[in-house]
């Protein structure tokens, strides 16, 4: 959502890449009695998604077998889920996660909120096209069929991917938007949700950051405080996620990661999704933000919250240890 200038992932193209050697190494690691999980995880995580796709193609050519199917049959549990996620083409991953969230058992609103609030307009357009091509279904129609109320309306607005890409900020419009948001919430009885939906789904990132500052000046409240007092349910959660992503995409996703591991139990699906989807974009930056916000490293929290090959794979995906 926010500008990703200076963003850095933890996974890059491997130098001296040899897809034939990698395919043979993976086949050997899964052939016969036992599976060499350590070799598999180290090889796949040290290759970019594009390189993994080439390995899968070469694997099928050499052995007449599907690499993902072999991983599924040889691995198990959360470790399998993570490694299989790494094999999904990057452009397809978000579309698959949304499809599962909408069409699985019950609607996984947190997944829909996380993806739709944090992706750029260009990424959302790509997700829509991929979703249509892969599932022969319209993302907007599926969302409308599975959600309701203002939550549905804001999602539909975000799916249009019409956020202003222009970096220039019009100070007069900033003032107008801040006042419109104030008049739609804190300054009236009830809440004019349409104003929040319209402004938060169409204005540019730099513009909205200025709007949030001006809103604080006018109202004496942070916009997040007003959203919490004026709205509720999934609509509130989505509004907050959009605002947080606009302020700092890395800050928002660091919070998502922290919440996936804090307290009893771990939301492994969220942990996997964020690490996999951001590993080649800005996971290094998310790691830095995580430490700054929570006083502990992402590595340390993963170390204490997970175990076995699954933990080893997650830690490797996070990049070098920064404790």
Swiss-Prot record:
GO MF assignments: calcium ion binding; calcium-dependent phospholipid binding; phosphatidylserine binding
Domain notes from UniProt: A pair of annexin repeats may form one binding site for calcium and phospholipid.
InterPro entries given in the database record: Annexin (IPR001464), Annexin_repeat (IPR018502), Annexin_repeat_CS (IPR018252), Annexin_sf (IPR037104), ANX5 (IPR002392)
Pfam name, any one: Annexin
GO cellular component: cytoplasm; nucleus; plasma membrane; vesicle membrane
General function of this protein: Calcium/phospholipid-binding protein which promotes membrane fusion and is involved in exocytosis.
SMART domains in alphabetical order: ANX
Annexin repeat placement: 17-88, 89-160, 172-244, 248-319
Biological source species: Cynops pyrrhogaster (Japanese fire-bellied newt)
Protein name: Annexin A5
């Amino acid at each position: 959502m926010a500008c990703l200038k200076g963003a850095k992932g933890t996974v890059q193209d491997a130098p001296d890449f040899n897809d034939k050697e990698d395919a043979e190494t993976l086949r050997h690691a899964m052939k016969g009695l036992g599976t060499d999980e350590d070799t598999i995880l180290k090889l796949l995580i040290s290759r970019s998604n594009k390189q993994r796709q080439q390995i899968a193609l070469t694997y099928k050519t050499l052995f007449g077998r599907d690499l993902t199917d072999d991983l599924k049959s040889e691995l198990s549990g959360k470790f399998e889920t993570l490694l299989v996620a790494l094999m999904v083409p990057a452009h397809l991953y978000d579309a698959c996660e949304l499809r599962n969230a909408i069409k699985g058992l019950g609607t996984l609103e947190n997944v829909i909120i996380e993806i739709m609030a944090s992706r750029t307009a260009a990424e959302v357009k790509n997700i829509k096209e991929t979703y249509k091509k892969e599932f022969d279904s319209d993302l907007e129609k599926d969302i409308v069929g599975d959600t309701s109320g203002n939550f549905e309306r804001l999602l539909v607005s975000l799916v249009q991917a019409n956020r202003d890409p222009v970096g220039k900020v019009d100070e007069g419009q900033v003032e107008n938007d801040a006042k419109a948001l104030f008049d739609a919430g804190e300054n009236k009885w009830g809440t004019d949700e349409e104003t929040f939906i319209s402004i938060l789904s169409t204005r540019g990132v730099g513009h909205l950051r200025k709007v949030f500052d001006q809103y604080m000046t006018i109202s004496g409240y942070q916009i997040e405080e007003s959203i919490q007092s004026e709205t509720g349910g999934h609509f509130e959660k989505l509004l907050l996620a959009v605002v947080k992503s606009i302020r700092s995409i890395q800050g928002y996703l660091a919070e998502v990661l922290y919440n996936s591991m804090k307290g009893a139990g771990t939301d492994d699906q969220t942990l996997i999704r964020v690490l996999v989807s951001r590993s080649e974009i800005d996971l290094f930056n998310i790691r830095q933000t995580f430490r700054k916000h929570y006083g502990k490293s992402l590595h340390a929290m993963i170390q204490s919250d997970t175990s076995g090959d699954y933990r080893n794979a997650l830690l490797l995906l996070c990049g070098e240890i920064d404790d």
